[in-house]
Structures are given as C-alpha cells and as structure tokens.
Amino acid sequence: MYLALRLSAESEQDIRNGLLWDKVEPVTPSEEFHLTVIHSPESTIKLKKHTSEAWEALKAAGAMLTDEPLVAHSEGLVTFGGGIKVAALKLNLTNRLDVFRTLAEAVLFEANIPWSTQWGFSPHVTLGRGRVKLTETFPSVVTFNSMEWRE
C-alpha cells in the first residue's frame, strides 16, 4: 500500500503539456501522476482497523487539501530506479510535505505496519519510463488537492 497525494487536474494537465518525450526511444508515460508520501508492503486492510491521534491528524491534514491545496516547487528532472529507470519531477521538501510524511510514519508505526526504508523520503512525481525533457511552458509550481491510501 502507499499514501498518495493527488495532483490537481490543472497541475496534472500543465505537467503533461510541459513534457517533451523522446521520439526515437520507446517511452511509457505514467497514466496518472501523484506523489507517494510513504510505501508499505502490507495491505490497507490492516490500516482500516486502526485508529489513533496520528491517524486522525493525518486524515484532517488530507481533508484540508481540498480547501488549501499543498503547493510544491519543481526542482527539475531526476532519474530513479535500478534496472528499469523512470523519469521523475523532483519537488522541494516543504514543511507541509514533511508533516504528511511524519504523520504517515506515525500511523504505520502505531499500527505495527512496516514501511519501505530502502530510500529516504525524496518528494517527486514519477513521469514514466523513457527520455523526457521539460519545455519552456513546464510549471515551476504544482498543487496537490487530495490524499488517498492505495493498494
């Protein structure tokens, strides 16, 4: 499972319009862009039975996104992955993003659910596989307006 922050429709469209994919090499753009706050190999079933102060605080922070979207500045393209590389948009780590991560860790810790620790938290939006460039119209700021746990 993972906790995803979902981009506003406008930000998702602005990102798609601001990408220039390689025309020679095969590319696979992501179907939907999001920011993974935290990842766990466990299922959300265990999480649905859990309640705590951290869980309530995280739900409240997620509900606030509708009225007060989270704003993040893009820091350019990066590449992640071992054998299969993916292009990603690196984002600055804001205090608000850090709060989401801290609360998500607390929720999983209190529920005795492990989370992936192989890499540190590096806020980014995975764009897809293949070579890509940013055009002049690429947004310098993106907004997230909802949160959800996914399988």
Task: Name each model feature, range by range.
Residues 1-151:
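Histidine-dependent nucleotide/RNA phosphoesterase domain, centered on the 2H-phosphoesterase fold
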